[in-house]
Structures are given as structure tokens and as C-alpha cells.
Amino acid sequence: MKFFVDTANINEIKEANELGILDGVTTNPSLVAKEGVDFHERIAEIAKLVPGSVSAEVISLDAEGMIEEGKTLAAISENITVKVPMTVDGLKAVKAFAELGIKTNVTLIFSVPQALLAARAGATYVSPFLGRLDDIGHDGLQLISDIADIFSTHGLPTQIIAASVRHPVHVSEAAKRGAHIATIPLNVIKQLTGHPLTDKGIEKFLADWNKENVEK
């Protein structure tokens, strides 16, 4: 499984990159707005920091507008992936982008049919939202399994990005169930590094070391 960080904050991206595990970045209009910066300038800045995929989302709701925005975003850098919502117009835009050789990430996926349609339209990635499905009592992880099975059965090359990741269990289970990528907030990435027994082990090693050196 590959790891993307879900943020538009430069310091968070740098911190994630220092861990040596960062394969890409996903952003959305809300994350960029929170930073209070120019959208295109921030996307360009992120693309220079990270060699992998950088998802930048269009805000138009009609296919024509999405295509124009997407072309502008794709021109920023080779590693830009245009993020498109799962709608009828979104599918039209994905088809157009595929014909232009522009990578796409179809977002706000909540069902198998949505993922299948996006893949058939030519999406590079689909992003099922785990946490938001959990919020309404549905099984987001089962959706990952179902999408992975169907993509495998039909030989579809579209990759699955586990999105709306809330905790480490989402990450480990999504990996087991066939997600190619997890896009994760930095605080959850940090949670992945920890375990109570790791902390206890470090404390014991240090205590034993200090005891041995004091006695000498």
C-alpha cells in the first residue's frame, strides 16, 4: 500500500515527507481554503515538494467547466492529478481527461456502482470515503473489498484510494481488503507509528541502560 497525506499545509507535507513513506498528496477546496492562500500557487508549491501524485480538485459542477479547470491544473506540473466529483458531469470530464492523458481521481465514492462507472470512464483513481460511510452506519471497509473484487474480476486498472481515514484500523483493514493507497491526515500517520508495547519496550531499554551505567 502507498501512503498519501491528506492536507494542503506545507509544514505537514514536509513533516510527512521526512518520514520516508510519502507517495503523494491529496487536497480539496476546503483544505486549501483553511490555509488562506491562492489555490493554484499552493498546488504548484506542493507539486515541487512531492514527486508523486498531487490531487487538486475542480470546483465547477458542469463538465465543460471541470475540463477547463482541469487543464489549467494539469499544466502546473506533470504530477498533478485532477480530482473530480462522482457525478454525471464528472464522468464526462473524466472521459475527456483520459483522452488527453490527464490523470484523474474521482472523489466522493460511496457505492460500488459509482466506483465501477468511474473506472469505466477512465479514472486513474477512485476514492471511497470510509469515515463518512461509518458515520451513517454503513461499512466503508466492506465497500473497499467489494470494489477491489470487482476491479480484479473485470481487469480494471483504476487504483483505489482509501479516503476519509479516521484511525489506524482504517489503514490496516483497507490494506488487507485491497486498497492500493490510503490518503491520511498527518495526525493519523503519527498514530500509525505508535503502540503501547513499543513505548513500554523503549522505557525498559532505557531503564536497564541507565541502571547499568549508574552501577559502573
UniProtKB/Swiss-Prot annotation:
Keywords: Cytoplasm, Pentose shunt, Schiff base, Transferase. The active site is at 83 (schiff-base intermediate with substrate). The lineage of its organism: Bacteria, Bacillati, Bacillota, Bacilli, Bacillales. Its main location: cytoplasm. Pathway: Carbohydrate degradation; pentose phosphate pathway; D-glyceraldehyde 3-phosphate and beta-D-fructose 6-phosphate from D-ribose 5-phosphate and D-xylulose 5-phosphate (non-oxidative stage): step 2/3. GO terms for biological process: carbohydrate metabolic process; pentose-phosphate shunt. Belongs to the transaldolase family. Type 3B subfamily. It comes from the Bacteria. It catalyses: D-sedoheptulose 7-phosphate + D-glyceraldehyde 3-phosphate = D-erythrose 4-phosphate + beta-D-fructose 6-phosphate. The gene is tal. This is Probable transaldolase. It comes from Shouchella clausii (strain KSM-K16).
